[in-house]
Every structure is written in C-alpha cells, then in structure tokens.
Amino acid sequence: GGRALLYYLIPYCAMSVGSFAVVAARERELNRPVTVENLAGFGWERPLLGGGMTVFMLGFAGFPLTGGFVGKFYLFAAAYDRGWIWLIIVGVVATAVSLYYYLGVIRAMYFRPSEELQLAPVAGGSPPRELVLQTAVTAAIAVTVGSFFAVQPLIDAARHATEFLFL
C-alpha cells in the first residue's frame, strides 16, 4: 500500500505542477482567471501548453501511457490484496465521475472554437517567466509519461522509501 502510494505521488505531483503551470501561463495571457470557457481553442493556440494540459488531464483520469494509470493500478492492486473491495469500487466510481471533468477541459481546448484568438500581449513582457512555465510543463510531461515507462525503478525507490519510513 505504501509503495503504491509513494509511486503514485511522483506522477501526481508532476501532473499537478504541470497543470498549474498551464493555468498560470493562460492567466498571464488573459489577465484574468482561467475558466473552462476561456480555454476554448487553447490547444490550437498554444500547442505545447494545450498538449501538456491534455497529458495531465489524461494522467489524472488514469489513462494508459501515463504514470496516473500505473499509479491507480498499483493502488487498486494494493487495496485488492488487503481485501478492500469497497475501496476499489469507490475509486472506480470516483474515476468515472472525474472523467466528465477531465475530458471537459480537453474538449474545451480542442473542440470548442475560440471566438477570437485570445492571446493578449503581456505588459512589460517577461520571456524568462514564459520560459520557466514552458520548461515546467515540458518537465512535468516527461515525468507523467516517463513514470509509465520507468515503473520498476520508481517502484524499487518507493519500496526502499517505505522500508526506511516504516521500519
């Protein structure tokens, strides 16, 4: 259980940081808070940030090829090993409900037309900040997808961490 949780924290933290970086970049462009409505067309306007947000939403939902999938799989397997079928049912239902929201963000970014190009010039311009946000998103994408392919080393690290923490 602890090993699965520690593994899941790796992609979950990356997905959280990445999605917040995307929102921060969008708020900076619009000079107002981000809503699903003002994400319309964002995936086409800003392919890196829109693609990143797509990867993060799919990861949160537990789609394959993301660390979110592996993390949920290991968490559900740990619950099954302990006989906590009720927890698996709650997790599956929560995941199904969350799909509506996660896929809604993706739908808005790619399938709702932007009424106008919503990019606004940033007062004073700050390329370094933009570079930092894009770098954070790129790194978070790498961890989200990479944690799917590097499962064993991360599980081994989680095992060592749980042995250290609980012994």
Residue map of PLM features:
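Alpha-helical transmembrane segments of multi-pass membrane proteins predominantly involved
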Residues: 1-167
